[in-house]
């Protein structure tokens, strides 16, 4: 079975890992980074992903960040490069880039992946993530929750232990807390809670607001009105936040950030950790309630928790760590890298699916209750939150009026008592119900949640056995036709990128060949006659001309490749003549050395060049 990669598709950064030799390993990106910025930009009609996109975010207005915060959002589109894109399409570009460098590392095609999502993602957000994977050319074998993945990474070498684990996961845009029980290789999620709109971006925004307000009061200029200045401010705020994780003060220096009546204006100030803590205190407080709710749902107290695992880059903030320690009464476990644990855990789950990881069972839960709207606008739950998945639940309902010919099934997800206060997942109708008094028809509604947390709903008239089924596709979701079109677009871009890379490689190889041949001719000097050197010199000039002719981006490279092959051939023949000319001399020296009676025999040890890589 082919490799299944594990992808942490994050708000701020993403990561990918694969199982090798029974251990999960992070795959580095082309820039050598172990994580990749979840940033997409467009330049000259072409998309760029990762570090290169993030580096030019300040100067390029067609740059998209934190798209994950809009996954599953009905009707949301972002305009860039003169076109509207859905969150699924932008996320697919990130996934496609990750898939590409994973294939380069593995040396084989990657077609399957386990992708993680925040535990508190609803059905629409999970479906959108799965669609993004499909657009990117990936078969999403499993969607798993980020805290659960982190627990897998933590517990892989502790399968013989019985522990209750609290995972506190504060990422760039989302917050989750999950409580798991680990025993005999079974990772059972007892409860989960969170906030899909709380993360590191919110901490950055607090600093941005503070700096912008301070600058406005001193200079009368609102930096938020200038897109370029605001992006510089965002970068400075994020940098200051990171600095304050290890220092008590961060310097912020942004020269020429704006213009005033008397000339250019500069932002030069400092931010102390104490002030940062003051600015973000409400965010840390906001994260406490989900922890308490998860604990209550699991029927546990803090004294029952054996380990507290921190995950997500934002857990590096000292005030966050202090809050967790104070709340739980335990020193958080720092044995896993908060930026990498989720991808590593996803790779472990990939190994479970392929059978490479034995004796590990993952039992996850649905984060929110599921049900339908009943008479009076009431939300009637069929599946309670924190129910282990996969699961199925049925309940019989009836009509609300005499001779009612059809029933509308309004499917919802949430915890509020009234339907209007919960999230609509979808609607469908069961028609052709035989005329009967109110309350007589028996309509059985069945909810089915698969291993990915994706919901299927059916309604059956038990009298006629007529049935209607739907896989929930929330408002704003993508149709099969839309996904197919986006897949084709993504594939076309992938092919265009491959051609572009081939062109660059061909030109680079030609450059290298020209350089090497010129160097060889220089070394040959007068050791060979002009007639012997002429074929190589002619082929060299022909390649130089072909390179000039193929300078345009859309140029045909056929002639350049042919001229490169010709030069390689004749230059090889020239090198052979040079070698043969030198051989008699070298042979004589060799004979002289073999006659030396003082030759020392050496002991040799065979070295495996791949030994370090196998560790």
UniProtKB/Swiss-Prot annotation:
SUPFAM superfamilies: Actin-like ATPase domain (SSF53067), Heat shock protein 70kD (HSP70), C-terminal subdomain (SSF100934), Heat shock protein 70kD (HSP70), peptide-binding domain (SSF100920). GO terms for molecular function: ATP binding; ATP-dependent protein folding chaperone; unfolded protein binding. It holds the Pfam family HSP70. The keyword Chaperone applies. Residues 586-596 have a biased composition (Basic and acidic residues). Signal peptide: none annotated. Residues 581-615 are annotated as: Disordered. PROSITE patterns: HSP70_1, HSP70_2, HSP70_3. The modification Phosphothreonine is found at residue 174. Residues 598-607 have a biased composition (Acidic residues). InterPro entries: ATPase_NBD, Chaperone_DnaK, Heat_shock_70_CS, HSP70_C_sf, HSP70_peptide-bd_sf, Hsp_70_fam. Keywords: ATP-binding, Chaperone, Nucleotide-binding, Phosphoprotein, Stress response. Induction: By stress conditions e.g. heat shock. HAMAP family: DnaK (MF_00332). Acts as a chaperone. Belongs to the heat shock protein 70 family. NCBIfam families: PRK00290.1, prok_dnaK. This is Chaperone protein DnaK. It comes from Leuconostoc mesenteroides subsp. mesenteroides (strain ATCC 8293 / DSM 20343 / BCRC 11652 / CCM 1803 / JCM 6124 / NCDO 523 / NBRC 100496 / NCIMB 8023 / NCTC 12954 / NRRL B-1118 / 37Y). The lineage of its organism: Bacteria, Bacillati, Bacillota, Bacilli, Lactobacillales. The gene is dnaK.
